[in-house]
Amino acid sequence: MYAIIKHSGKQYRVSQGDELKLDRFEAEVKSSVEVSEVLAVCDKELKVGAPFVAGAKVVLEVIAHGKDKKVVIYKKRRRKDSKLKRGFRRQFTRVRVVDIKA
């Protein structure tokens, strides 16, 4: 059984027991979060929502919060002695899929 969920404008295919990194959201570590924006559920047959499947929920357990590796953005304009170097670290929340209710 798997489900396709929408979170922070992105779509994820999840199964029970999967771990994934979502964009950071406010939740306590080891707490449960329910996602009701389920686009599709497959349990022997595929149910596709319009836009969401009615009554379907995915229960997530928050494992940890953290930051990704730094991404360096470097811009240089030739012959103008103009350059720009910036860094960015995306914050994420690591979650585990506990249950899929369809």
From Swiss-Prot:
Q: Which GO terms describe its molecular function?
A: rRNA binding; structural constituent of ribosome
| Gene label | rplU
Species name: Campylobacter lari (strain RM2100 / D67 / ATCC BAA-1060)
Q: Which UniProt keywords are present, listed alphabetically?
A: Ribonucleoprotein, Ribosomal protein, RNA-binding, rRNA-binding
Q: Which domain of life is it from?
A: Bacteria
The residue ranges crossing the membrane are none
InterPro entries, A to Z: bL21-like, bL21-like_sf, Ribosomal_bL21, Ribosomal_bL21_CS
Cellular-component GO terms for this entry:
cytoplasm; ribonucleoprotein complex; ribosome
Q: What is this protein called?
A: Large ribosomal subunit protein bL21
Which interval of the chain is the signal sequence? none
